[in-house]
Swiss-Prot record:
Keywords: Cell inner membrane, Cell membrane, Membrane, Multifunctional enzyme, NAD, Quinone, Translocase, Transport, Ubiquinone. NCBIfam families: NuoD, PRK06075.1, PRK11742.1. The lineage of its organism: Bacteria, Pseudomonadati, Pseudomonadota, Alphaproteobacteria, Acetobacterales. Its main location: membrane. Its EC number is 7.1.1.-. It catalyses: a quinone + NADH + 5 H(+)(in) = a quinol + NAD(+) + 4 H(+)(out). This is NADH-quinone oxidoreductase subunit C/D. It comes from Gluconacetobacter diazotrophicus (strain ATCC 49037 / DSM 5601 / CCUG 37298 / CIP 103539 / LMG 7603 / PAl5). The keyword Ion transport does not apply. It is found in: Cell inner membrane.
Length: 601
């Protein structure tokens, strides 16, 4: 009797209307192609217009959306859904798998279009679109790796997140999710040799020549345990002397199935897992996840909780950018700054620990609000830090950004322009360093960012130096935002008065046996979220981070898609390193600002 009430309560808020702007224009372009191309139309709870198109029409539709390039349209994400166990599919074409392409227009207010392609259970296949959007290359490899969907015409369709010897496709519903579901593991000597052999790099398999007209090429493994690659990450370099001819990034060593875990945890208990994706981002990882759940549930977050979320997220942005700043200087040979900046980061963690109880991974956001109210004395801690850090940043400006050696190592190195950034799916500071003033907090404001005053730092050259400059300027803008949160923190509730708020406010749970049962079910089973799908995106520390969640009317997500900024950013390494030296590559890697858990999930 209780569970249906929870569902009915959440379903009172219908899906929002489709947005206008370039997203509607893209949708209109697709709709004009006629019924032979568009199989169905739907609007998800996030309001993103969605068109189902036939597999044979995919390239024609994508090619049309690619032009004109001046429209600043980005292939934001490409993923898939295993529909075979999904119960609620009203109005959707019958299929076993769905390919999902998410497009975003950066020329205006960030409007979006979602294309879906229905695919059969046996030998699902679609044509590759990597020649239209180069960032589709890795996304298509990921979909083939995890779902077994073949992309015809893809130049190098091979596993990317799982080992080359892996059997099966992990995000299919019939694939095991835990080691306890697998046979006991054993590794014979022959299997060990086969695993080692599978890791050997074959240049011919990647279309790489072994010789030039003048010399033999050397192939060098940089990583997976080199300190300059910032994690377990391998780049195979094709070298002529010390000059880089080409590079092949090899990722997946950190992959631990975060999206698969989302199908086994309750909506509430998955929150701590989000912290571990970008492990330097803390609650910034919670942000898009809880926003997506709140869209599905129809929850409106109180103003005080929204402001607290923004303040904590910006504190973590400062902490993450300080790590980037210090490690970047260390990568190019300066040893002192990293110690100063990590000391400053400790001050941020002292504030976060005082508010949240934990430092790096507080898992502090909740569905409908935050875990608890601000403690006594929080404002004094933050005010002291806001006075402390700006003079330190001034010192770092003299120490690092005006240093002639640092400038020589970074100016003009690893440069790309706006069109290349959009084609490769670059967002965040890496995009703004090219000169495009586009920040989701300003263009598509969420959680009250539209009530705050801040600038969008940009640069012009898109090189290593400018990427560092933008990060530094963003620290100052984050301090500006935090000060406004400090001075304008509203009074009121920290959780929404909604039956799907999890955990529910304690005042609502101690009245009688009925309210106690609601509390017990909400905490033990988790909230029952009504059927639907929703996408939520935030301007995270390294770029745009989004969650696309599908509910089938249960206590767990049917599909959890995590789109991280670091994944497409690393894909650009070959483009911006060709012709450079190995020392230049070290600076390029440091300037991208990534962590491998954010890449591999």
């Amino acid at each position: 009797m209780i569970v249906p009430d929870l569902v009915a309560d959440a379903m009172t808020a219908g899906p929002p209307a489709a947005k206008s702007g370039d997203g509607a224009t893209m949708f209109g372009q697709v709709s004009d192609l006629g019924p032979g191309t568009v199989l169905a139309v739907e609007t998800a709870r996030d309001g993103v217009p969605t068109a189902w198109i036939a597999p044979t029409s995919l390239r024609a539709v994508v090619g049309m959306l690619r032009e004109p390039a001046a429209a600043l349209r980005m292939l934001f994400d490409l993923t898939a859904i295993d529909e075979r166990q999904r119960a609620h599919r009203v109005g959707q074409p019958d299929c076993a798998f769905t390919l999902v392409c998410h497009f975003m227009a950066l020329g205006g207010a960030g409007d979006a279009l979602r294309l879906k392609v229905p695919l059969p259970a046996e030998a699902p296949r679609v044509p590759s679109i990597a020649d239209f959007w180069p960032n589709a290359n890795w996304y298509e490899r990921e979909v083939w790796d995890l779902f077994g969907i073949t992309f015809e015409g893809h130049p190098f369709l091979r596993r990317i997140l799982t080992p080359p010897t892996w059997t099966g496709h992990p995000l299919r519903k019939d694939h095991y999710a835990r080691a306890t579901e697998m046979p006991p593991y054993s590794l014979t000597e022959d299997q060990e040799m086969a695993e080692q052999q599978a890791l050997r790099f074959d240049p011919g398999a990647w279309g790489m020549a072994r010789h030039s007209a003048h010399s033999d090429f050397m192939f060098l493994n940089l990583g997976p345990n080199h300190p300059s690659v910032h994690g377990v990450f391998r780049i195979v370099l094709q070298l002529e002397g010390e000059r880089i001819v080409d590079a092949v990034p090899d990722i997946g060593f950190h992959h631990r199935g975060a999206e698969k875990m989302g199908e086994r945890q309750s909506w509430h208990s998955f929150i701590p897992y989000t912290d571990r994706v970008d492990y330097l981002g803390g609650v910034m990882n919670n942000f898009p996840y809880v926003m997506a759940v709140e869209k599905l549930a129809g929850i409106t977050v109180p103003p005080r909780a929204q402001m607290i979320r923004v303040m904590l997220a910006e504190l973590f942005r400062v902490a993450s950018h300080l790590v980037f700043y210090g490690t970047m200087t260390q990568d190019v040979g300066q040893l002192s700054p990293v110690f100063y900046m990590f000391s400053d980061r400790e001050r941020v963690f002292e504030i976060i620990e005082a508010i949240c109880g934990f430092r790096m991974h507080p898992a502090w956001f909740r569905i409908g609000g935050v875990a608890m109210d601000l403690p006594r004395g929080w404002d004094g801690l933050i005010r002291d830090f806001l006075d402390y850090l700006p003079p330190r940043l001034d010192e770092y400006e003299k120490m690092v950004m005006r240093n002639p050696i640092f400038r020589a190592r970074t100016i003009g190195v690893g440069a790309y322009d706006v069109s290349e950034a959009i084609a490769w799916g670059v967002t965040g500071p890496g995009l703004r360093a090219c000169g495009l003033e586009w920040d989701l907090r300003r263009k598509v404001p969420y959680s009250g960012y539209d009530q705050l005053e801040f600038d969008i730092p940009t640069a012009q050259n898109g090189d290593c130096y400018d990427r560092v400059r933008v990060h530094i300027a963003e620290i100052r803008q984050s301090l500006r935002i935090i000060r406004q949160c400090l001075d304008g923190m509203p009074a009121g509730a920290i959780k929404a008065e909604h039956r799907l708020t999890t955990p529910p406010p304690r005042a609502r749970t101690m009245h009688d046996i009925e309210t106690l049962i609601h509390h017990f079910l909400s905490v033990s089973w988790g909230p029952v979220i009504p059927p639907g799908e929703a996408h939520a995106c935030v301007e995270a520390t390294k770029g745009l981070n989004s969650y696309h969640l599908i509910s089938d009317g249960g206590t767990m997500s049917y599909r959890t898609r995590i789109r991280t900024p670091s994944f497409p950013h690393l894909q650009m390494i070959p483009l911006i390193s060709r012709g450079g030296m190995i020392a230049d590559l070290i600076a390029i890697i440091g300037s991208i600002d990534f962590v491998m858990a954010d890449v591999d999930r």
